[in-house]
């Protein structure tokens, strides 16, 4: 059984002995995994750590502002807007596995540029057990696991043996705000794994707004306290609809809500029908490009939590 205090002491010592007096950067996303890893690394090497937040243009609504506000005064913090670079590389790509690999590669290219600039030798990552288990099992690549050959930086992964519930325990022991610890997981590739087919700026905005509506309604209902994840997926399916008395043709959006303890398995709970109806009405009313909303009822397995 995990003893948070013992784990923290051992992890800090391991990071310190590995990095020594060298400089390191950490890939900070604002999620609980990278946040916990950043605090552990900060305790171990202090000012020799630089936290790098990369905006790849695929973040959920308000995410960049949240991360900057939360971490800019806590750590040596660098914000990098690399959205143009990521979106250019993703042009015309439809295969979800290829999207994940491209995003992982571009992340590393950005981190290596920053590392060269500040003279860092190590890259600290918030990789956790489900990430590498799914990657090694060839279920899907994770951006922080499928790293390119020839990587210059040496990787440090202080929480790679932990599951999400254990990471949250460590976060609480470290004194991180409960609000941060309990945030629902958001995938490293961002909305790229919630957009089926080619990624375009129009699709990103549609998916971002649909996700925001789902999050707002779930939090308002209080159901967020029992759910692992809740989000919207923009499919590549176009469906006929009616706006007023006129035929319309727009996208199909899928709502997904699951319960889980560690992301290795997940189940779809009994959901309040009035909540689903509210979400559906808001999405079709507030996002004119969407004509239909569906609900995913598949557990993991056989499905994965994210669509792509």
Swiss-Prot record:
Nucleus recorded as keyword: no
GO MF terms, alphabetically ordered: ATP binding; GMP synthase activity
SUPFAM superfamilies, A to Z: Adenine nucleotide alpha hydrolases-like
Catalyses which reaction(s): XMP + L-glutamine + ATP + H2O = GMP + L-glutamate + AMP + diphosphate + 2 H(+)
The UniProt record lists the keyword Glycoprotein: no
Alphabetical UniProt keywords: ATP-binding, GMP biosynthesis, Ligase, Nucleotide-binding, Purine biosynthesis
Pathway, per record: Purine metabolism; GMP biosynthesis; GMP from XMP (L-Gln route): step 1/1
List of residues binding ATP: 29-35
Domain GMPS ATP-PPase, chain residue ranges per copy: 2-183
A cellular-component GO term for this protein: cytosol
CDD domains in alphabetical order: GMP_synthase_C
Documented EC number(s): 6.3.5.2
Any one Pfam family match given in the protein's UniProt record, by short name: NAD_synthase
Known partners and oligomeric status: Heterodimer composed of a glutamine amidotransferase subunit (A) and a GMP-binding subunit (B).
Function: Catalyzes the synthesis of GMP from XMP.
Protein name: GMP synthase [glutamine-hydrolyzing] subunit B
Organism: Methanothermobacter thermautotrophicus (strain ATCC 29096 / DSM 1053 / JCM 10044 / NBRC 100330 / Delta H) (Methanobacterium thermoautotrophicum)
């Amino acid at each position: 059984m995990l003893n948070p205090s013992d784990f923290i002491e051992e992890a800090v010592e391991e990071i310190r002995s590995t990095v020594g007096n060298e400089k390191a950067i950490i890939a900070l996303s604002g999620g609980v995994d990278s946040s916990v890893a950043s605090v552990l690394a900060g305790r171990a090497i202090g000012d020799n750590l630089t936290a790098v937040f990369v905006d790849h243009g695929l973040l959920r609504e308000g995410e960049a502002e949240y991360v900057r506000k939360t971490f800019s005064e806590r750590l040596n913090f660098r914000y990098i807007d690399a959205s143009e670079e990521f979106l250019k590389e993703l042009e015309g790509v439809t295969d979800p596995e290829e999207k994940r690999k491209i995003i992982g590669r571009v992340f590393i290219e950005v981190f290596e540029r920053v590392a060269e600039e500040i003279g860092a030798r190590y890259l600290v990552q918030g990789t956790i057990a489900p990430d590498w288990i799914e990657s090694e099992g060839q279920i899907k690549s994770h951006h922080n696991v499928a790293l390119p050959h020839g990587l210059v930086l040496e990787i440090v992964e202080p929480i790679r043996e932990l599951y999400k519930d254990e990471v949250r325990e460590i976060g609480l022991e470290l004194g991180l705000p409960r609000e941060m610890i309990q945030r629902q997981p958001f995938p490293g590739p961002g909305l790229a794994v919630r957009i089926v087919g080619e990624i375009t700026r129009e699709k990103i905005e549609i998916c971002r707004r649909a996700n925001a509506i789902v999050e707002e309604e779930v939090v308002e209902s209080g159901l967020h306290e029992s759910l692992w994840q809740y989000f919207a997926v923009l499919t590549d399916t176009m469906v006929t609809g009616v706006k007023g008395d006129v035929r319309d043709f727009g996208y199909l959006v899928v709502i997904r809500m699951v319960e889980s303890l560690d992301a290795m398995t997940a189940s779809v709970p009994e959901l309040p029908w009035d909540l689903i109806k509210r979400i559906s009405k808001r999405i079709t009313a507030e996002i004119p490009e969407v004509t239909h909303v569906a609900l995913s009822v598949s557990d993991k397995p056989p499905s994965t939590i994210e669509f792509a």
